[in-house]
Amino acid sequence: MAKFRRRTCILLSLFILFIFSLMMGLKMLWPNAASFGPPFGLDLLPELHPLNAHSGNKADFQRSDRINMETNTKALKGAGMTVLPAKASEVNLEELPPLNYFLHAFYYSWYGNPQFDGKYIHWNHPVLEHWDPRIAKNYPQGQHSPPDDIGSSFYPELGSYSSRDPSVIETHMKQMRSASIGVLALSWYPPDSRDDNGEATDHLVPTILDKAHKYNLKVTFHIEPYSNRDDQNMHQNIKYIIDKYGNHPAFYRYKTRTGHSLPMFYVYDSYITKPTIWANLLTPSGSQSVRSSPYDGLFIALLVEEKHKNDILQSGFDGIYTYFATNGFTYGSSHQNWNNLKSFCEKNNLMFIPSVGPGYIDTSIRPWNTQNTRNRVNGKYYEVGLSAALQTHPSLISITSFNEWHEGTQIEKAVPKRTANTIYLDYRPHKPSLYLELTRKWSEKFSKERMTYALDQQQPAS
């Protein structure tokens, strides 16, 4: 009997040793960070839902997305409150990727909700009618009704948020920092102006500048086509921006090859103003000229049609950008024309700034515009555009957009959401951070390649 007990103890000990060895072996084979755990330091961002490391199979993605969707939906019930991110710890910038100040992203601060603004703004965007009544009658009309029905084909991870919410602004800055975006190009209207579906937003600029500075981001201005925009009020508005915000450490200035540090202004829909009017502002002899004054800058025109090239030269602009995320929509947004545009810019001493987007879909507000939809193809469309931009050796690259949700060009985090009437698009089978991660990847590639051909490698002036 004693001999049997001894044998049993030996066998049991060997079995325990085998199990222990097996567990240790598996532990060594399993990576410290699973394939789909938070990469690139994104675990530093305030997350709405904790992300557990898992094997990354399709079932895991679907299960995780269901949890995200359910949590998001619950948080949005009752007055559509902004989904507040978890309180962040002190920012450790050393753990975040380096910034690329030659990569800009168009940023919109026009969103609002009842919690912060007393009503929904922009999320309840009206459905726009086609200009031809014969076509318009075939499509729905009316207005979106947040929080479950918003004017977008995607749904934000932060819900129908307010651009006034400081925690939302901070989360946006963290996301851009995680993507190695160095500069946000802020959509801007003068203090007494607004877009057709929004409210005045200039009062938000100080908070945006402060939050950007916390992450070493810079802010430049994307001047919208406000009512009656001309040389005189543009001069006044440029003076206003520089006088009010120009001394902030987050205010962006570009160091030119001649050593000057100048503010930069993207001018949206510049082509609707006659070249002779722009020349009054942008040429040295103009009646409203800012040249060689404290209000001089780099003024970047939107090139839509090929014929705009000569208008831009006559106007006195310093460069061009293409804005639209739909390849083939305009001459300027068509990748196949970018090499020619770059040659034109080099010949005429202009900056060339191609604009790249992750996709395009605006059918939530323009249901008749399906011909301009561009599928994201799980990030491939975005990467093709970024590759085409890099091949031109551009001065800068602009991203359309960080958060233009109406046109489906956002790289901001989006989550799955389903309602009784709508199934929103999302980034599956990838994570909500897919386009931030792709942006970081190409930002690093652009930074390295730019060093091989550009002379202006300085950091932006503070």
UniProtKB/Swiss-Prot annotation:
Region (Catalytic): 60-462
Record field: transmembrane: 10-30
One GO cellular component term noted in the UniProt record for this chain: Golgi membrane
Compartments it resides in: Golgi apparatus membrane
Broad class of enzyme this protein falls into: hydrolase
A Pfam family hit: Glyco_hydro_99
Post-translational modification, as annotated: Undergoes proteolytic cleavage in the C-terminal region.
Topological domain spans for side Lumenal: 31-462
Cytoplasmic-side segments: 1-9
Catalytic activity of the protein: N-{alpha-Glc-(1->3)-alpha-Man-(1->2)-alpha-Man-(1->2)-alpha-Man-(1->3)-[alpha-Man-(1->2)-alpha-Man-(1->3)-[alpha-Man-(1->2)-alpha-Man-(1->6)]-alpha-Man-(1->6)]-beta-Man-(1->4)-beta-GlcNAc-(1->4)-beta-GlcNAc}-L-asparaginyl-[protein] + H2O = alpha-D-glucosyl-(1->3)-D-mannopyranose + N(4)-{alpha-D-Man-(1->2)-alpha-D-Man-(1->3)-[alpha-D-Man-(1->2)-alpha-D-Man-(1->3)-[alpha-D-Man-(1->2)-alpha-D-Man-(1->6)]-alpha-D-Man-(1->6)]-beta-D-Man-(1->4)-beta-D-GlaNAc-(1->4)-beta-D-GlcNAc}-L-asparaginyl-[protein] (N-glucan mannose isomer 8A1,2,3B1,2)
Bilayer topology annotation: Single-pass type II membrane protein
Record-stated family: Belongs to the glycosyl hydrolase 99 family.
Name this polypeptide is given: Glycoprotein endo-alpha-1,2-mannosidase
UniProt organism field: Mus musculus (Mouse)
Organism phylogeny: Eukaryota, Metazoa, Chordata, Craniata, Vertebrata
